[in-house]
Each structure stands twice: as structure tokens, then as C-alpha cells.
Amino acid sequence: MKFIDRVKIHVKAGDGGRGCLSFRREKFIPKGGPDGGDGGRGGNIVLRVDEGLGTLLDLRYQIHYKAQRGAHGMGKNCHGKNGEDLEIRVPPGVLVYDAETDELLADLTEGCHELVVVRGGMGGRGNARFATSTNRAPRHVQPGVEGEERWLRLELKLLADVGLLGMPNAGKSTLISAVSAARPKIADYPFTTLVPNLGVVRCGGFKTFVMADIPGLIEGASEGHGLGTRFLRHVERTDLFLHLVDLSDLQEGDPMERFALINRELARHNPELMEKPQLVVLSKIDVSEVRERLDAVRAAFAAEGIRTLAISAVTGEGLKELVAEVARELEKLRASRLQADQKAAEEDEPWQPDLS
């Protein structure tokens, strides 16, 4: 399936139905009076989260969406039927912007599962509504109000617990395929991964976490080099970064420098990303040359106060320890977040006098 994470669509709510001009016509009632009904309300357009979707592909090929208009009013005081709402299903994690003003309308995550983006117009009033003591036969009716319309820009940010960082060919796709059921394309050339991939990792019992693999970063990515930072927004929601450093390619320079380079590009894209905790993972330790220099590299990171984990996604060495460490870190982060939320809730409680 093609991965689409940004689309622009036009939405038009339904117009309200027109009020009816009608007079009561019955035998033996020569002056029955007005009986024109009101028009129906136009339908709204609603964005609704569908947990089964993971891309905006369906919206790529249909740009214009129009809800049903309200039915016109009828005689005998019959009101027109309201137009049906039109639902547009989107994956969780979509940011909804007004395309003309760039205003953020909503973030459709777990806390917000639907959003009315445009509302239908009200139906017009029939002539029965305008009858007065001095005007027994009004011939005035109201047209329906036009429904709202606007251009929207939808941007998808994947929802994941752990994001994988690293240069191209660092082994990110191999890692996610080794610890989950995800099957991204894997090859021995840079930029094999062209779109983000998600994988669900089981860490014992019923506990799981979601890992996101994005295309690798290179120097100048914040300026658009390589694949740029287009896909970095997909790891902005993650709680933890796994920063993979490939030790097998000696031509790429010092591992510490490559580690710092990725962090510089990350900071240029969004300084807030640097506040997220990182676990540094030294990859491809199954290669003999890597074994020889592994201790020296770990010592260099340790001198900077950076703890490292060593793995081989091919042989499986170190993967069990890595998954366990990630699970522990996520548990700590969730516990601290829960504690902060409880503290904030206690501070928001209104003061009450002690009556004891």
C-alpha cells in the first residue's frame, strides 16, 4: 500500500432547504390560511478516526466532498428532511489545518475521535411562520442558508512509543523486522526505507509497544538534503528514541561524530525533540571488524556519560536485552507522566474550608 501522509481536500456542507409557500385547501374552509413548512437543515461533514487506517491514501484521489442538502418544505406544515451528515474516515494521529489560514483546527489522537469541520445551513422558514393578526395570508418564505465550505490540509503523524533514529543503512529496518512482524524493504544500499514503518513489539505477557522506523538522516537533512526531515514529524509523538549507530562502515567516520551529527539535524528541525530521552544502540556487532573496536567505541561514549547497548539484528544478539530495556524506560516515563498528571489535578482542585 502506498504511504500518503499529507493531503489537501475541499469540504462543502449541505445547503438548507427552502421554506414552502402554501395555503390550506379543504372543502368548506375557504380561508384555510398558510400551511407552508420549513426546509430541512443541510448535512455536516465530519472527520472520524478509524483505527484500522494507517495512511491518507483514500483521500488522495478524491479532493471534493459535499454533504447532502436539506429537503425543501412542503404544504400541510410538512417540514423538509434534514440532510445526512457525510463522514470522512481518517487514521489516528491526523492534524487538521485550515489550508487558507494555516490554523490548527484539531489533533485527532486518542482524546479526539471526531471533528465537525463544516456545518450545514439552516433550513428556510415557510410562510406559515409569518402569519400574524394583521397578515393572515403571508406570501413570504425564506430560502435555505448555504452550508459552510473550506479547504483543509490533513497531515498524518504516526502514533508510536519508540522512534528509530540513525543514518541511512544503520540497520533500523533490520531491527524493526527482527523484533516485530513488520516487513520493511531491506537492502545493502542507502535510503532503502522511503516511507515510515510501524511494528508492534511484544515484551512479555500482554505488554507491547509500537516502534516507528523512518528514513535515515544525513548531514544537511534540515535543509532538505537526502529525504530531508519530511518524515521526522512521525516520531514527534514518541516517548523514546532508539539512536542506532552503525559500526561496520569505517568510511563514514567516527561513530561519536555521526551520533552528534544526527542530533544536530534533529535540533535544527525541532529543538523540543532533543528533550526526549535516547537509548544509544551500537548495531551490526556480528561483523568481525566491529567486534575488535566495540570496547573502544563504548568507552568513548561512556566518557561522555552516554550508556550504550550493542546488538546484532541479524543474529539476534542483544535484542532480548534491548527490548527489556526499552520496556523499562517506557514504564518509567509513563509512571512519571501519571504522577505529573495527578499532581496537576490536585492543584486544580478548588479550595474548601476545613469544617472538622
Swiss-Prot record:
Biological process per Gene Ontology, one example term: ribosome biogenesis
GO cellular component term of the entry, any: cytoplasm
PROSITE patterns, sorted: G_OBG, GTP1_OBG, OBG
Protein's cellular compartments: Cytoplasm
Residues annotated for GTP binding in this entry: 166-173, 191-195, 213-216, 283-286, 312-314
Coiled-coil annotated spans: none
Cofactor(s) for this UniProt protein: Mg(2+)
One GO MF term: GTPase activity
One Pfam entry name: GTP1_OBG
Catalytic activity, EC: 3.6.5.-
Binding positions for Mg(2+) per the UniProt entry: 173, 193
Family: Belongs to the TRAFAC class OBG-HflX-like GTPase superfamily. OBG GTPase family.
Its biological purpose: An essential GTPase which binds GTP, GDP and possibly (p)ppGpp with moderate affinity, with high nucleotide exchange rates and a fairly low GTP hydrolysis rate. Plays a role in control of the cell cycle, stress response, ribosome biogenesis and in those bacteria that undergo differentiation, in morphogenesis control.
Listed NCBIfam families: Obg_CgtA, PRK12296.1, PRK12297.1, PRK12299.1
Subunit comment: Monomer.
Name of the protein in question: GTPase Obg
